[in-house]
């Protein structure tokens, strides 16, 4: 493998290098789950490396490169298992072959259905699209981060037809065709809730309930939150450290996927001991989420500063698990 650097432990492997070089070493039907956030088709540039999928000249060029990754993910995923993609609408006009990126800070900028094009690509590569979750974002927080004038109250004063939406993130679910050889079963239901809501105290007695599962009110409550198509209970700031990973000329965008989102995906769509893979590792969030839930995590990241931050973050995974055990 043309890998720049690697860190291999019993329960995780981190690679600094091209994700295609990492994936080609996997045998067919090996991965229990993949979860990742791809570069948003050039909306943010993370490096000048020509292998970096964020470093593209057009929306179409991004998808031409991304298709190779999706096909490899299809090959290495177990039949019947899930590939989860975190994404959102992006500023611009048109879709597919006509799409042209715009600037999100400009008033009146349209939106490109980036999730829709991801869905169509996955279907082209053999995946079955089987649902999406929307992840709520606080409007003022989005306004302050992006400085989009269309989210400012002043735009209401001037012309509210040009107001924007604090666009929700989306987690798309794709299932590989075929029968799942190892069901992801939960004989005593779900044991832990990842989110900001407070579970009613009287339900705690049902945690790990071994009786008739129709009576497991603890797990039922968690599942109602997870089954919703709109996740408005994600702790937005529950992310891994990332500030040290920034280069001096970095975009301001770097913001890892929330651990609540990752934990839900890992628990729902993989078994303990299975491999969870992320081709766009960033600072290691998906690998971390796999490891702390007794899975094996593998991640590939091209950018050296992100990789080094991932190494630091994963080194603290045992400490995190210990702290969580003390909280229980």
Predicted regions and their residues:
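Core catalytic lobe of class I
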Residues: 2-309, 327
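PRPP-dependent phosphoribosyltransferase catalytic core
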Residues: 308-328
